């Protein structure tokens, strides 16, 4: 028992000594090098505290690529075509907002976003002679916004161009009536203007334009319009460049009604006229046409809108002076229906010519009829109806001396 006690006592002292030695190293580590004695077991890093694990830095966000903005028209542009769209195009970002407005009134112009928000395009027409501001805000991939403001002005009023169409909208005319367009300014870009005017026949009939000058163009088909149909005329001329800086200032759609087919066949040799309605003979009358010094024009003439129940004809209007052969001073007539600008009419013959109807040609180129015949024409024939004259040695009227278009072969009419 005593030996065992003696054996245990030294071991207890050894443990105390060892613990004391370790304590000294740890304390010393607080003020010196933090190294462990070589006789201590190595630490297991996999069991270390969370604070001793290496931290992982988050992946840095790359900087946003700067947005590039292209605006049309460019800032400060003058004489912008009001029919052209205003565009904002963003690259490396989107168009967050766009406001296009009249700088004087604040009136805004609508627009739409396209290409996933990268492009804004105006959707409404602009006004002539107006200053506009265009404020565009873009956003980059990080959501950072930037605003760009520009101004521009549109074409001044002095460069507006328009036209007048004959016949007027909703008018009813005969089957031979060409459509005529008279422009306020010379048209240089004729193909562009033709493309902007769409003419549709209810029967599908197709015609062609024929330019008589830079300000006048007409349109007709190869044959007369079908009776009792309609034409639709779409004039989409707003913003169309006529040339010389002139810009079309309107768009409009008009309808023209086509009535019965009414054709007068005038025969100078037979000294008579026959009138057909829808290819059926309606009336025939004795007539007097142009004499040998003033023969009637041959070919086709279209009735104009000029009708006079009572009219005074003056010889001076056809170039005759007092003392000239054929000078008649002035005469009063009834039921005058104009066929040409140069003075060809269908009218009631003068009292002195009445006995010669159907017998002798006495006129200065007009078609003289009885009171009954001239009255019937006055009441029953309308603008766009046609007169076809044969049996006379004279040439046809000029195409623009009234409507002499039908004297031109269609192949020639349709060519430039």
Whereabouts are the PLM-identified features?
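Exported/periplasmic cell-wall-interacting domains
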Residues: 175, 298, 314-416
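Soluble periplasmic/extracytoplasmic beta-strand elements of cell-envelope proteins
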Residues: 70, 87-89, 133, 151, ...
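Short peripheral tails and domain-boundary helices/loops at the edges of structured domains
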Residues: 160, 166, 262-270, 406-416
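Gly/Pro-biased beta-strand-loop elements
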Residues: 246, 250-355
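Actinobacteria-biased recognition of intrinsically disordered, low-complexity terminal regions
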Residues: 1-10, 413-416
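Extracytoplasmic/secreted envelope proteins and their assembly/folding machinery
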Residues: 87, 133, 149, 180, ...
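Short, charged beta-turn/beta-strand-edge "cap" motif at the junction between a beta-strand
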Residues: 138-139, 237-239, 279, 309, ...
């Amino acid at each position: 028992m005593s030996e065992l006690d003696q054996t245990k006592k030294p071991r207890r002292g050894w443990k105390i000594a060892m613990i004391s030695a370790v304590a000294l190293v740890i304390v010393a580590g607080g003020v010196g090098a933090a190294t462990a004695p070589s006789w201590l077991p190595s630490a297991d890093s996999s069991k270390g505290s969370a604070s001793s694990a290496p931290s992982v830095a988050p992946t840095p966000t790359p900087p946003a690529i700067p947005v590039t903005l292209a605006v049309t028209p460019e800032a400060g542009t003058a004489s912008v075509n009001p029919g052209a769209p205003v565009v904002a195009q963003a690259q490396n970002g989107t168009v967050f907002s766009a406001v296009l407005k009249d700088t004087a009134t604040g009136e805004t112009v609508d627009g739409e976003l396209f290409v996933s928000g990268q492009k804004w395009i105006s959707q409404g027409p602009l006004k002539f002679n107006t200053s506009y501001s265009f404020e565009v805000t873009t956003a980059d991939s990080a959501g950072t916004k930037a605003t760009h403001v520009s101004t521009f002005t549109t074409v001044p009023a002095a460069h507006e161009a328009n036209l007048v169409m004959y016949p007027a909208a909703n008018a009813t005319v005969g089957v031979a009536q060409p459509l005529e367009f008279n422009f306020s300014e010379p048209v240089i870009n004729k193909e562009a203007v033709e493309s902007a005017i769409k003419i549709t026949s209810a029967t599908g009939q197709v015609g062609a334009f024929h330019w008589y000058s830079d300000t006048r163009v007409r349109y007709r088909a190869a044959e007369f319009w079908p009776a009792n149909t309609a034409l639709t005329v779409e004039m989409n001329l707003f913003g169309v460049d006529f040339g010389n800086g002139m810009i079309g200032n309107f768009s409009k759609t008009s309808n023209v009604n086509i009535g019965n087919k009414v054709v007068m066949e005038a025969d100078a040799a037979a000294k008579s006229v026959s009138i057909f309605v829808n290819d059926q003979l309606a009336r025939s009358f004795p007539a007097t046409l142009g004499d040998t010094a003033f023969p009637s024009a041959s070919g086709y003439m279209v009735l104009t809108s000029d009708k006079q129940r009572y009219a005074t004809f003056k010889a001076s209007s056809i170039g005759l002076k007092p003392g000239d052969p054929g000078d008649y001073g002035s005469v009063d007539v009834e039921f005058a229906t104009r066929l040409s600008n140069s003075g060809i009419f269908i009218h009631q013959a003068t009292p002195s010519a009445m006995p010669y109807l159907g017998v002798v040609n006495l006129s200065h180129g007009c078609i003289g009829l009885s009171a009954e015949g001239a009255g019937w024409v006055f009441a029953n024939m309308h603008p766009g109806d046609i007169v076809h004259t044969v049996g006379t040695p004279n040439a046809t009227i000029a195409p623009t001396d009234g409507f002499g278009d039908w004297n031109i072969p269609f192949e020639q009419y349709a060519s430039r």
